Curated annotation (Swiss-Prot):
Gene Ontology CC terms, in alphabetical order: extracellular region
Biased composition (Polar residues): 408-422
Record-given protein name: Toxin YqcG
Organism: Bacillus subtilis (strain 168)
Taxonomy, superkingdom: Bacteria
Amino acid sequence: MKVFEAKTLLTEAEKRAQEYKDLKSKMVKLKKAFKAVADLDDSEFSGKGANNIKSFYEDQAGIADQWIDLIEMKISFLTSIPGFLEDANLSDAYIEETFLAHELANAYTKSKSIMSEQKKAMKDILNDINDILPLDLFSTETFKNELSSAEKKRKEAIEKMDEVDQNLTSEYGLSEANEQMIQADYQALMNATAKGKSASPIHYNAKAYRDSEIHKMTEDVKKQSTDYISFKDQQAEQRRIAKEQEELANRPWYEKSWDAVCNFTGEVSGYYDYKRAADGVDPVTGEKLTAGQRVAAGAMAAAGYIPIVGWAGKLAKGGKAVYSTSKALYRADKALDVYKTPKTFHALQNSSKGLYGLASANGFSEAITGRDMFGNKVSKERQEQSLSGAMAMLVPFGARGINKKLNAKSSSRVSEASTNTSKKPKVPKTYKRPTYFRKGVRDKVWENAKDSTGSVKDPLTKQVMKKDEPWDMGHKPGYEFRKHQQSAMERNISRKQFLDEHNNPDHYQPELPSSNRSHKGEDMTDDYFGD
């Protein structure tokens, strides 16, 4: 028999999370101690035995790092429990499964039976006096509706309790699997210290340990931990944004002006409109926005467009925000399931056309006059992008094809067209941009970018990236293509030499598409740091 007691669960989860935080602090100190021994200078500690001991503690530090990742997984899991309960409306619930599954179920059946018997008895009585005083039999419709509503709540309570139990159990199971892998890796480390019947760090065989099958799997464990923690961070952010939307959903859109735009969210590329409205700075270009652009961003967000999932009023049914433990991956549409709350979008759905009208109007204003709806001057780049943006906002409301009729181009093509109008020296075919990189170049760039923890971070946003998700081959500052092209022409090198330099992994770094295409991290000088 299951007994669900939210208060006890939340209290214990908070307590255990704090214990793990304390443990993490101690493990970090232990890792530093291991590293201190491993990094001892030869003048302080040398010899074959010394090298074995230093290698031993170097690998011990690696295992300590795995424990730290596991602890962070545990903390992420425990601190997400309040969100799980809130999603299921069980934050203050106390439920005994046997009461719901048996007592209430029996009461439902018995109540229906009693009412049926009473109605039959009353019908017989009324039939007996019908010739004297005709009377209508009372309606049981209200009773049936109330009983049906109670039965629905009973079933939903059981489903929610089972769902929360399943979600928490499956996610916790993921960390248990990682824990077993770390323990096995530690055992492999200990086995590598054995020599005959004795075991000591002085006998440590680093090659045997590092070549062991179990140790080779630690990268997968590391990735699984990183992916899970990243998922929980995103989940927490989405829940926070959903709360803000629910608070604003009951207000008419025209009241959501300057003080409210900071709380809207949503855009095809993520929640960039939320960031634009809240911070007043475009997260892609770094450009400071005018008041009109901030209001338009708020309107765009408030209309309810949710990344990946789609329009608020047309969200796909089914699925849960459950992390898949089988492949250590999660589906984006499931992770965004938290947005599927009727309260959040009820008002927004009804007002979305007006909101997009507001955002679109600001776009036309910028494109035609070079100023936003409040009269503030906008940059030339923003003006070029505004027309296509305004057109795109009208598409959901019957304006499909309008871009073609009015010859409106996409923002990238508008920018490209305006750039092409200016006269530029013709680039010889020898130095034209290649359409692809040689085999293995992208993999090498990714490997070169890994930090000491094995993570790859976007240089602009510092966000941890995933190799199996979209990323760009961004030029390192000083190695931009325009500089390389100019340098190649000045040196009059061959096409082969040009391609060899173009495919040099040392000239590139992994970047998020939004960071790479913003050109924000480029070196604006004409100096080329290559060959």
